[in-house]
A protein has these predicted regions:
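Mature, well-folded catalytic/scaffold domains that follow N-terminal targeting or propeptide regions
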Residues: 1-340
Length: 340
């Protein structure tokens, strides 16, 4: 039995304390990774002392910034979707809705309207929600839903040009080659994604993407494999978010509609976000020597729990999760790279 299985209640107090004390963002619209990293640390086996130390260390980023105050519930969440100032009203709304409907019914109701905004704050709306679902804390689930809804951002759909579909390999090669000649200087990932969505390469690749896969999960698996390969050849910070973002979609997929129309539309949205994120990454493609033999997951998990790097912690957790889902041994290499 793992540490996480043996002590399933150890995470809740830390998530609750975070909600009571800290905001959702800090500095220049940077998403707080504290609740996500806490869940990852717990899942990787961090003990109580390590959880406390990481919480104290990370909390310094919020110096002087209070947690959001409570507000009356929004009457129509879709009417204020994408309005950051409505976060507290959305949080009150989702708190009442979850109490009335339960988790599964509420997720099935709202996720179809949230997914088109998957690019929100560089996938962090979806990423935080996936961690919240797995963490099992009702308050964090409410906060994650409200965060995604208030920061909801949909990339523009490019005009259809009737181009033929490329194979997955050819499409990926065109993305890598085309993105190498474009660079944005916007400070945040999501701003660079927005800028990328106005470029001809985005329009081209969004419409010559491979034909729809049989299911959304099948397309997620294909894109996850590509993102993993990109990371192994770049160790790129934005590609890291593509890996954790795709993991989030896989975790949330059971609550998404299964009808063919939605599944195809969801693949289009995800493909557009994938293109924009890779372009936003300013990826420097290079041959990074891979270790012939790397440590086991147990060793990497232990190392991650001692890290102060919230992104490394989350990536090791995500890679272990994705390795279990897909059986791809390259995830072990990626996790080891994140801890170097």
């Amino acid at each position: 039995m793992t540490h996480a299985q043996a002590n399933t209640t150890a995470l809740a107090p830390w998530l609750e304390l975070n909600l009571q004390q800290f905001p959702l963002e800090y500095a220049d619209q940077l998403s707080s990774h504290l609740p996500m990293a806490l869940h990852a640390l717990h899942s990787l086996g961090a003990d109580e002392a390590r959880m406390a130390a990481f919480f104290k260390s990370y909390s310094r980023r919020f110096d002087g910034v209070p947690a959001p105050a409570a507000e009356p519930a929004a009457r129509d969440w879709l009417g204020v979707r994408g309005d950051w100032s409505a976060y507290s009203a959305l949080r009150s709304y989702f708190e009442l809705a979850l109490a009335a409907e339960g988790r599964d019914a509420r997720l099935r109701r709202v996720l179809p309207d949230l997914l088109p905004g998957i690019s929100a704050v560089a996938f962090h709306g979806a990423i935080r929600l996936a961690h919240a679902v797995q963490g099992g804390h009702a308050g964090e689930l409410v906060a994650a839903l409200a965060y995604w809804a208030s920061r909801w951002q949909r990339l523009p759909a490019p005009p259809q040009n009737g181009a033929a579909c490329l194979s997955l390999t050819a499409w990926s090669e065109r993305l890598v080659a085309g993105a190498a000649t474009w660079r944005s200087e916007a400070p945040n990932i999501f701003l660079r994604m927005l800028e990328a969505s106005g470029r001809p390469l985005y329009a081209e690749l969004a419409w010559v993407a491979p034909a729809p896969a049989p299911t959304l999960l099948a397309r997620v698996a294909e894109l996850a494999s590509l993102a993993l390969g990109y990371y192994l050849h770049s160790a790129n910070f934005t590609v890291l978010h593509m890996i954790t973002g795709l993991r989030a979609v896989r975790v949330l997929a059971p609550w998404l509609p299964q009808d063919k129309t939605f599944q195809i539309q969801a693949q289009e949205v995800l493909t557009q976000a994938f293109v924009a994120a890779y372009m936003a990454g300013r990826v420097q493609w290079r041959e990074i020597p891979l270790t012939a033999a790397v440590a086991t997951w147990a060793v990497l998990a232990d190392a991650a729990t001692l890290s102060e790097d919230d992104h490394a912690i989350k990536l090791v957790h995500a890679c272990r999760d994705e390795s279990a889902a897909y059986g791809d041994p390259r995830y072990l290499q990626a996790a080891a790279m994140a801890l170097r």
